[in-house]
């Protein structure tokens, strides 16, 4: 029998292989094929946001000051959404609205669509980066799957919701106080806190925080060696030879506390993955529903009885009145181009007034 020794010589001028070798090379900051999407999009999204919050006014779109140049601070500066009249235009710099004029493009709100679209693709690129690295080091892709949850929330809130409404104008602007205003808008116009998908989202996020705190404390509790002095801070000693974390000890502890406890590390950590990811996905689904103007729970019988009986009021009916007040105030303030005027007699008031 003849055995031939040698190696397969690949075509040295294969551009794909040259690119693949350079992109996936082991270096301090991994680039990868996903980096071709991630790094440019993240750079443009962050650069657009810093540029907008520093220099660009919202006077022409919202009648507001929104930049450091105009006197805003970190909490009040924002990259604001385009004007309502521009509907769902992509607001390309070379498009019919700005016609290549950068100053006009900024005044019309072009930076918002620029940041939103590059931000969305940047987040997707980051998820693909986790897929790519997991495949390279032979890990399962649960990190990327988990990161799909914040991507779903971003896309549903910043893109799908305004697509279901009359324009990008009704999306959140990119700023701290601007996001708070958007939350108030969601409550007043959609009664978001009474939406079951919001409830599932809150349960997921707060439940995940609770699980994270419990898990971290339990691991720290059982990390240092038994019988070596009950000093909490020994858990932070970096010179310990090996990990002494005991799943059995943790299981016995929580069995005594709650009567039940996780007995399997895989199930425990899957549950910690499942709770926040499912909560965020449910929130995203709920926001898609709001884009279509689907309503939350309505307890009409309580509203009718409150209207008929001055002595009957519930927390629900009080919240409905509060929502009416938000709408009456915010519609006129938030959409000055509509010239909305609400006479005193239509403004909401509680039964006590």
Curated annotation (Swiss-Prot):
Pheophytin a binds at residues 130, 143. SUPFAM superfamilies: Bacterial photosystem II reaction centre, L and M subunits. The keyword Magnesium applies. GO terms for molecular function: chlorophyll binding; electron transporter, transferring electrons within the cyclic electron transport pathway of photosynthesis activity; iron ion binding; oxygen evolving activity. Its main location: plastid. Keywords: Acetylation, Chlorophyll, Chloroplast, Chromophore, Electron transport, Iron, Magnesium, Membrane, Metal-binding, Oxidoreductase, Phosphoprotein, Photosynthesis, Photosystem II, Plastid, Thylakoid, Transmembrane, Transmembrane helix, Transport. GO terms for cellular component: chloroplast thylakoid membrane; photosystem II. The D1/D2 heterodimer binds P680, chlorophylls that are the primary electron donor of PSII, and subsequent electron acceptors. It shares a non-heme iron and each subunit binds pheophytin, quinone, additional chlorophylls, carotenoids and lipids. There is also a Cl(-1) ion associated with D1 and D2, which is required for oxygen evolution. The PSII complex binds additional chlorophylls, carotenoids and specific lipids. The modification N-acetylthreonine is found at residue 2. GO terms for biological process: photosynthetic electron transport in photosystem II. A plastoquinone binds at residues 215, 262. It is a multi-pass membrane protein. Chlorophyll a PD2 binds at residue 198. Belongs to the reaction center PufL/M/PsbA/D family. Photosystem II (PSII) is a light-driven water:plastoquinone oxidoreductase that uses light energy to abstract electrons from H(2)O, generating O(2) and a proton gradient subsequently used for ATP formation. It consists of a core antenna complex that captures photons, and an electron transfer chain that converts photonic excitation into a charge separation. The D1/D2 (PsbA/PsbD) reaction center heterodimer binds P680, the primary electron donor of PSII as well as several subsequent electron acceptors. D2 is needed for assembly of a stable PSII complex. 2 of the reaction center chlorophylls (ChlD1 and ChlD2) are entirely coordinated by water. This is Photosystem II D2 protein. It comes from Phalaenopsis aphrodite subsp. formosana. The gene is psbD.
